[in-house]
């Protein structure tokens, strides 16, 4: 037996056909929430994603091709996306690993300058199930984002969309 609260116990079931129609502002029919994830991948550990499967299999360290894929995003991809989002004045949320503020501060500075909303995304790109102290990781992430922006981050998106049964309560 476990004391953990399951996700299905946090939310009462509600079929969409039994709910009142959701009225959106200005008669809109759809909401689009633009979230840009920016992450720090540790080159001394197996990479969180494999775009290129190593020829010999396994998880080589360093895994330069997959680490470089992430690094391209921070050096090029972020800036190209930001240019388009700025051009069309798209309100954006930056889901960032807290360590972005120290390892890639230029990215965080530009998002802050653009008045983007900041959302915690772990301190580094490591599954919440693998983080040694989840409470500390979340607190460290919140603290560094608040120190950088002057505001608490709004919301949480676990790295790789992961969370534990305790994440919501932390």
Predicted regions mapped to residue ranges:
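Catalytic alpha-helical scaffold of carbohydrate-active enzymes acting on polysaccharides/glycoconjugates
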Residues: 2-155, 160-170
């Amino acid at each position: 037996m476990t004391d953990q609260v399951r996700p299905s116990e946090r939310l009462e079931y509600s079929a969409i056909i039994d709910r009142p129609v959701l009225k959106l502002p200005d008669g809109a029919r759809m909401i689009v929430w633009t979230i840009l994830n920016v992450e720090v991948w540790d080159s001394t550990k197996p990479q969180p994603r494999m775009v290129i499967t190593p020829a010999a299999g396994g998880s080589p360290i360093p895994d330069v091709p997959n680490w470089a894929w992430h690094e391209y995003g921070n050096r090029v991809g972020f800036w190209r996306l930001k240019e388009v989002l700025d051009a069309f004045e798209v309100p954006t949320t930056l889901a960032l690993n807290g360590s972005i503020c120290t390892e890639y501060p230029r990215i965080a500075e530009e998002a802050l300058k653009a008045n983007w909303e900041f959302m915690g995304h772990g301190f580094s790109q490591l599954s919440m199930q693998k983080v040694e102290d989840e409470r500390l990781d979340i607190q460290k992430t919140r603290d560094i984002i608040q120190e950088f922006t002057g505001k608490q981050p709004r919301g949480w998106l676990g790295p790789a969309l992961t969370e534990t049964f305790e994440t919501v309560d932390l």
